[in-house]
Amino acid sequence: VLLHIKNERRGRAMAKKRIAVLFGGASADHAASLHTAYSVLSSLPKEIEPLAIGITRAGRWLFYPGSYENIKDGSWEQDSDCCSCVISPDMTNKGVIKIISDGESTIHRIDAVFPVLHGKYGEDGRVQGLCKLAGLPVIGNDFAAAALCNDRRIMDLVLSDSNIKVIENVTLHRSEMNDMTAAIKKITGKLSFPIYTAPTSCSTSVGACRAENEKELEEAIKASFSHHPYIIAE
């Protein structure tokens, strides 16, 4: 009996950790996430058993059992073995629920979630909050830190309130586009050219623009606002 217990404990200790790797996402950074996912999935140590979960641009969650090579160019979505899935919110039954076409479902136990999503829905605390609700550990920032750091407008306010220096900037709300002359004056009254504008909550360089004069600044403001209701100028 003691030998059986010892072997059982050894088996549990040697069991691979199963990590759900989320990639893709319904954001402007979808393509960048695919390349990140390929890099992560190809580099995980053998002690880790990954479950690849892709999220389409439309927001559909799919369990993907195919080759990681197909993730890079987006062809993974056409794999016939893909099936719908969702993270179980049940803390007593932690895992990924695979939904088969005929309505049947199975649950795959997971130990943690690794979101390699970029931008909206991925780095803004929403996925992290879902995992918190499900009682699953998340690799990376917790939901509060993710939400704060993803919004540069709010992050700068928090840092400034903590007496941490931030680069001089001006933020605008989309409603200020109704008076473009005033919006430009608000920025140029504080900043000198060249001026950069960007959405406050997009990752990478999505919506980022450089302006050398007021005419270019007007176009930059419009371009940045096409991605988010708040922009920041520096």
Predicted regions and their residues:
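Phosphate-binding site of ATP-dependent enzymes
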Residues: 209-234
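Structured loop/turn residues at beta-strand edges in well-structured enzyme cores
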Residues: 108, 164, 191
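ATP-grasp fold ATP-binding core
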Residues: 159-160, 187-208, 229-234
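Basic phosphate/pyrophosphate-binding loop/patch that engages nucleotide-derived ligands
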Residues: 158-166, 223
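ATP-binding N-terminal substructure of ATP-dependent carboxylate-amine bond-forming enzymes
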Residues: 8-144, 148-150, 154, 161, ...
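Phosphate/pyrophosphate-binding betaalpha-module
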Residues: 165-173, 198
